[in-house]
A protein has these predicted regions:
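Active-site-adjacent betaalpha module
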Residues: 1-28, 70-75, 87-90, 98-220
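A short alpha/beta connector and helix-capping loop motif
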Residues: 25, 41-72, 76-79
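Surface-exposed, active-site-proximal loop segments in enzymatic domains
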Residues: 44-50, 93-97, 173
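Short acidic, Gly/Ser-rich segments with clustered Asp/Glu that frequently serve as metal-coordination loops
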Residues: 35-41
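A basic- and aromatic-enriched beta-loop-alpha substructure that forms the phosphate/nucleotide-
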Residues: 80, 84-86
Length: 220
């Protein structure tokens, strides 16, 4: 899949390239909601509709996230994880959107296995892990303060779900005047249709969408 596919009507007639290089000193990798609970989707009778998501997570998203982690760690660049989990077992500290019935009714207690980061991409020593009860990582944590304290100007957002927590975080970061990059091959939504549609909406307005390999090539 090429980066050019994610062009909305607003930018389809423009040859728009924002990034010629990415600074190692002022760029952070933010990994959003890649947690154990989501590895079960598509593998049970009641979640079979997520089989496409499950395959993409296993074969594309996790391998490319590993690749990004390797390159960021090799360069001693900042890595931050964010996960969705409640501080209370009953989940009363969750935001309203996480308490409503249906898909968004997410109850993951912070100490439970399901809420932990997937083992194969688990954080290493001194890699920050934030816990949120919201879609946006900025709204639900002190991420904004951390990024400012760390002198971060550009944030690479990987993770799930493209059309939900990733999108909410990207928009919030953009509104706070951070440059945002989204690797299309290290993110996923419930379906490819949702994934592609959301990236097309976000691209060139709230972020720049590109491949993981392109991001690595731009690191300087």
């Amino acid at each position: 899949m090429t980066d050019n596919i994610f062009l909305s009507v607003y930018y389809e007639d423009q040859n728009y390239h924002k990034f010629n290089a990415v600074s190692e000193l002022s760029t952070a990798l933010l990994i959003i909601d890649l947690q154990n609970t989501y590895t079960k989707l598509g593998k049970t009778a009641d979640t079979i509709r997520f089989s496409q998501f499950s395959q993409r997570l296993e074969k594309i998203v996790i391998p490319n996230t590993k690749k990004l982690l390797f390159e960021f760690r090799k360069r001693n660049m900042q890595i931050i994880y964010c996960r969705i989990a409640s501080h209370l077992k009953n989940g009363n500290d969750r935001s309203l959107s996480q308490k409503l019935e249906g898909w968004n009714s997410t109850l993951l207690f912070k100490d439970d296995y399901d809420s932990q980061i997937i083992d194969s991409i688990a954080p290493q020593s001194e890699e920050i892990v934030l816990t949120k009860t919201t879609d946006s990582a900025l709204t639900g944590t002190n991420l904004r303060l951390l990024l400012n304290n760390l002198s971060i100007k550009t944030v690479v957002c990987a993770g799930i779900f493209t059309d939900q927590c990733v999108s909410s975080t990207v928009r919030s970061l953009s509104d706070e005047s951070f440059d945002v990059i989204v690797p299309h091959d290290a993110t996923a939504a419930g379906t490819m249709e949702l994934h592609n549609a959301e990236l097309t909406i976000l691209n060139h307005i709230y972020c720049t969408v590109m491949s993981s390999d392109k991001i690595i090539d731009l690191l300087k």
